[in-house]
Amino acid sequence: MIPWNAYVRLLRLNKPIGILLLWYPTAWALWMANQGFPSIDLLMIFLLGTVFMRSAGCVINDIADRHIDRHVARTQFRPLTSGEVSLSEAFILLFILLCASLLLLLKLPINCFYFAVISVLITFVYPFCKRFLNAPQLILGLAFSMGIPMAFIASGKNLNSDFVVLFLINFTWIIAYDTMYAMTDKADDLKIGVKSTAIYFASYDRLIIALLLIFLHSLWLVWAINKNAEWFFYLLWCTAAGILTYQLKLIYARIPKNCFKAFLVSGYYGLVMWFAVGLALI
């Protein structure tokens, strides 16, 4: 009998927050590069690509961490660790996902291929970075930002000032929200020697997260002023600022379940800013 439920959990399809956090920056880029009106074809290619590559990343991560996950309370029952899915099954799923992603990539300009290769290489390397880099979130930031240049290139645009601002916003955002995520497992990670910015930042974790959020949210103002955005952009910008404030409140006591909740709330920030970008470009 095929363990469909275990496959769904291995690919994290039951927890779509990872897909959303990869999709929103790509959507921001598609809207920016197409003046608010990306084609249906591009949307479908990038949306499916997001799902396939995020799922592939989860499989790669679980293959690399299958011996570590059993020592972390939050991950000890993942399908590979628990034996519900075999290692060979995981590799077959990974192969299928990468092939599906390649088929989508063939529909995009050749220059997208170079960024896709970088993305795949980083995705394979990232799980191992947690073992020797104090700030593996920097690597994750690169991996989760590759959809941005690909969206601009696929839309026939140069990597212009909009791209630079958006790349900085997303890279900073990833470090901030993944540090919140890492705060959830900090106690277990310290025991088994897994590294993260939550550990590296030590007692300055909340302050650094706050500074990162202020920086990235301010960059949106730079973009909006340059685009002569109307008042509704700023209304949504203020709403998003409220979401960031709520996240900082959640992580204040460093309670693991609240830190994880703060991470999940990042999805609302991405959604609100997607609406803000879309309205600003109408």
UniProtKB/Swiss-Prot annotation:
Alphabetical list of Gene3D superfamilies matching this protein: UbiA prenyltransferase
Pfam families, alphabetized: UbiA
Membrane topology, as annotated: Multi-pass membrane protein
Keywords annotated in UniProt: Cell inner membrane, Cell membrane, Magnesium, Membrane, Transferase, Transmembrane, Transmembrane helix, Ubiquinone biosynthesis
Function as written in the Swiss-Prot or TrEMBL entry: Catalyzes the prenylation of para-hydroxybenzoate (PHB) with an all-trans polyprenyl group. Mediates the second step in the final reaction sequence of ubiquinone-8 (UQ-8) biosynthesis, which is the condensation of the polyisoprenoid side chain with PHB, generating the first membrane-bound Q intermediate 3-octaprenyl-4-hydroxybenzoate.
Family as reported in the entry's similarity comment: Belongs to the UbiA prenyltransferase family.
Name of this chain's protein: 4-hydroxybenzoate octaprenyltransferase
Organism: Legionella pneumophila (strain Paris)
